[in-house]
């Protein structure tokens, strides 16, 4: 497995654990849920920024596709859908409502195929298509996000 794939798959696994921690915290009490959700929200946004600012533009450049008709454009739409769900959860928590499981399930539905596309198409393609120098530069940029 290449550098980009390894790094991003590990980040996906870490995010899945942060998501599980939020779900568990929500079962405890409101304060735990809010603190855990804040961490989740921050980490998801960091991850999406990394992809949208570093990896997706590189993928589009190297494949010769535009941001309107590439695999990355679909992934960006899914990011937007997840962020809308995250905003819904935040609003629910702010209103004192811990019943966010159905919104969490929607996020999980979106993310299953999303992660598969990234892990099985985008990241491996980048690992194969980029020169060793481009991979070093990309790795450095990923670690700064």
Q: For each of these PLM feature ranges, what is it?
A:
Residues 1-145:
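Small-residue-biased structural context
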């Amino acid at each position: 497995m290449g550098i980009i794939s390894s790094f991003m798959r590990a980040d996906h696994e870490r995010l899945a654990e942060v998501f599980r921690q939020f779900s568990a915290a929500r079962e405890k009490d409101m304060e735990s849920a809010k603190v855990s959700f804040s961490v989740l929200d921050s980490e998801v946004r960091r991850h999406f920024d990394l992809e949208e600012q570093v990896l997706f533009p590189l993928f589009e450049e190297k494949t010769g596709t535009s941001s309107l008709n590439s695999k990355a454009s679909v992934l960006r739409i899914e990011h937007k859908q997840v962020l809308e769900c995250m905003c819904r959860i935040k609003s629910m928590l702010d209103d004192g409502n811990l019943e966010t499981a159905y919104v969490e399930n929607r996020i999980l539905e979106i993310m299953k195929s999303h992660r598969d596309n990234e892990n099985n198409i985008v990241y491996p393609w980048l690992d194969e298509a980029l020169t060793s120098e481009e991979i070093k530069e990309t790795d450095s940029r990923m670690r700064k996000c």
